[in-house]
């Protein structure tokens, strides 16, 4: 297999096959794949540990397993007991399970605590060529390092804990070619929202997406993680970017990154992790980066988006009946009128954070817009770092002072308002400009309405009170 040109995804896959499934094509049996890194949190792991306990099995590789508390944790008063009994039980259960099975845990208050997809990269645990899994759909984030990273279900969590392997069928591959240079004020969040709008929320189903092209190479690691994070919103199994000097610069010196001669050997191996010339993808998409502008969702799935300069679409303009019905239903829930300029849509809340946009670069971008300005009257803004280490760095740079001076709430680390599983939620009817990844009905709280945006758009929106880009503040 190695004598033919291969894609990045194929290379990583084939390096991890423990046992190849019998057969060919659609009838091929699953391969048994070795897992290099298993990330765990409090929501999808309790039943998995119960299964191990019932079967009398240990965790096979606790040294390749790391846990953190993120989904259910509060982002204020973290020194007090968690108020919600279900959330408190899940967090306490994770602590007991990690202690019993010998798994390293970063609890609330720990400097390395935070959202699992922020913590893994910041510790240098995520490295090129790895297979990475977690009981969380946005595990695809780690693909920004050239890793094959996938979200898995609770039964699969148990299987990996017990065997350090997964039974999987090979995925198809899709190249997302983003050529040219991004205009000023356009970010990777705008790019991925545009990709999803183009191919749809099911366009990537069954595929691993590989992001390629000049615009991708020019992105920071934080920006690349944002794009790979939302591959799932396009229906994909994973997203990947070949490692390069940007990757190595990010990783070098991190706690779990190789050191000395091991680092040199690792980089030499990582340099081979790129799609070979002549390799054939199952599908390809081309996007002109120079044509993109700040993007925003108007509906109730991430594919229902448009440039901020557009108006709310008319369902009648959709050619497909299913799309027309979906758009009409979304607009009813979002309480939007066709033809309304998106820049005139007022918000109650702005959220900057999540595993999509809760890293230090995202906070710097938001702070740059907020510096010397105030959050609009009647708007509540939450800024939630993706990890306690990100928060510490932001404090060191004075970003926390900028947020609070502007009237925003500067909080502790956690998933926060990305999802309605902790105290940070919208009230029914409230509208939020959010840097998170999903805008489903009730995602941020029952009856809440979500517009997905970049940190730049979020900060500008907080200042003006309506969906806005930084250019609108000039």
UniProtKB/Swiss-Prot annotation:
Cofactor(s) needed: [4Fe-4S] cluster
GO biological-process terms attached to the record: L-leucine biosynthetic process
Listed InterPro entries: 3-IsopropMal_deHydase_lsu, Acnase/IPM_dHydase_lsu_aba_1/3, Acoase/IPM_deHydtase_lsu_aba, Aconitase_4Fe-4S_BS, Aconitase_4Fe-4S_dom, IPM_dehydratase_rel_enz, IPMI_cat
Any one Pfam family match given in the protein's UniProt record, by short name: Aconitase
Catalysis performed (reactions): (2R,3S)-3-isopropylmalate = (2S)-2-isopropylmalate
Identification of the protein by name: 3-isopropylmalate dehydratase large subunit
Transmembrane segments: none
Subunit structure and binding partners: Heterodimer of LeuC and LeuD.
UniProt-recorded Gene Ontology molecular function terms: 3-isopropylmalate dehydratase activity; 4 iron, 4 sulfur cluster binding; metal ion binding
